[in-house]
Amino acid sequence: MCGIAGRILNTPGQIGADLLALMDAQMHRGSDSTGFALYGIPVERGYLVRAMSPKRSSLSADLEEFRATLKAHGSDFLEDPTWDNAETQHASVRMVIDEPKNLAAWVRDADTFSDHLEVQSVGKSLEIIKDLDSASDVAEKHGVQDFVGTHGLGHARLATESSVSPTASHPFWARPFPDVAIVHNGQITNYFLSRNRLERKGYRFMTENDSELL
């Protein structure tokens, strides 16, 4: 039993605050974790990247290694990375990067580093923000209520099978396609069979959440 909300605005506006109100109204649908896929004002150059670090204490060193994967693909940070100032062990990181020569190839390399810094979204305007706890708590921690954009998705999760963690939360980025995010409510009964088939074709999964299969 999870909760899903969506919002579209004709012109850029307070999409974060609107989605927060929608998610607060269905907090009874699940409060293990909450996530938002927010579409803001597109960057003129490069991509917005959201990532999750499981170990805040090593974040600075991990970002340097992450930067090396960017440089290997003809990219680099266009701005200094920023992250939340919470006291949790994990940290949500926001980056603006130059466009890699081949986005899919860079994502494959970056995913090998996911134990240290997991890419959760890439796009011209998409930013996926997700974390443990209720919508209001997640929004306050990450400033969701101040986000300006045109559309977005929200998801309140009540975990049934896979773990409760920031990375297993919804929404999911449809890697490696920029600006594509999904949320899902339900259970995919042939998840493991389908996952095994896709892994044999070279697809990489970051969690055991069946929604990632979509």
Where are these regions (language model features)?
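Conserved short alpha-helical segments that host acidic/polar catalytic motifs at enzyme active sites
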Residues: 1-214
